[in-house]
Amino acid sequence: MSRVLIFHYHLNPGGVTRIIESQVKSLMLGSAYRDIIIVTGCCDTPRPFNAPGTSLEVNEDLNYLSAEEDPRKIYSRLQDFFSGLVQKDDILHCHNLNLGKNPVVTAVIAELAWKGYYVLNHAHDFAEDRPDNFAFMRETIERKLGKKLSPVLYPQLKNYLFATLNSFDQQRLVHLGIEEERITMLPNPIAGEAITVNNTIKDLKQKVCDQLHISANKLLVTYPVRVIRRKNIGEFILLALLFESESHFLVTQPPRNPLELVPYLGWKKFCIESSIPVVFEAGLKTDFEELMRATDFCVTTSRQEGFGMAFMEPWLYGKPVIGRNIPEVTRDLESSGVNFPMLYDELKVMSRDAPVDFSSLGDDEQKVYITDLQRNKNRKKQLTEMNPWLKTMFQQVRNELIEENQTILLNEYSLENYARRLESLYQKFAR
């Protein structure tokens, strides 16, 4: 049976690393594919990947590529690395290969595919949605490595398959010219058990609020994410201001990427100077599991997600998800039967005397609007009139609906189902 080589640039804590952990666990449930090598550029905590049948290969050339590095030298080194590692029947399962984080890896893997090796490009996100990434990809592959971009990113080869997280991205690949039979939708699994709301939650909420130095007499509204730009934190802060009399708004984690740190610190400073009571980094100040069990609602204001765990995991804690809808993500969940009674498609505001969606404004424009909202009562009235759903944002959700969502999520997106989908996908290479 083929070995599976699972690649990602790093194994830092985060969404893709969690999926790789789930991937390994699912294959170990009884799959025929139980000889696994994790291939990565960085792994500070190898313990989760030390399962029987699993080994770890770390090569720092596989990590994110900086603009200062010479891609030609790295290309040569990686050719040697993979030639000594990959066997002819291996399956190279590559996460976010085309994201533009290390275009040299993208080019080397494409070269292996053109030589006949089996490659699965597991696309969580796309460089086409990130102009800086795509420009870096084009510069590295075309100008510095002297290769045509399209045969590197989207080889027209039967031994080069794609997996997407949702049907929207599946159709995106079709429009890019990839045959439908080479694309498989592989939704992420969701781990854990459904938590039933009970009377102990009140005591737990008091404990969490004491640790965060806030009152337990208000609603806890938690955004369980690491704050990066696409999470649209300005909109979260606007909502925190709008509902400050009845709610505490908390966000759990700061960014890791140094490039994301500057705007994040700018928003923290803005909230302090404007006396907007957002609790930043709540996940570092109290136990995350206890926070999720104690919270009243989970909110998302994200503009873009590959799969959208923020729309799924809160339900397992018995918490309704409220906030900004991402139709290309939620439509697959809704088709499975998951119900989202309190999502909005846009937050209309007046900017330069014209209505716009708040998420389309830049950070500085968002801060100007929030400051005006804070100072001008008429602006709050106008905002509510333009977005009547704001009046019912925190309406109570029936326990029956929460339990129905929990059941669907645990059945449809179980580790067992993921294992079946993954094995079926790998078997395509043998046809």
Please annotate each region the language model reported.
Residues 1-431:
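Catalytic cores of nucleotide-sugar-dependent glycosyltransferases that transfer UDP/GDP/TDP-activated
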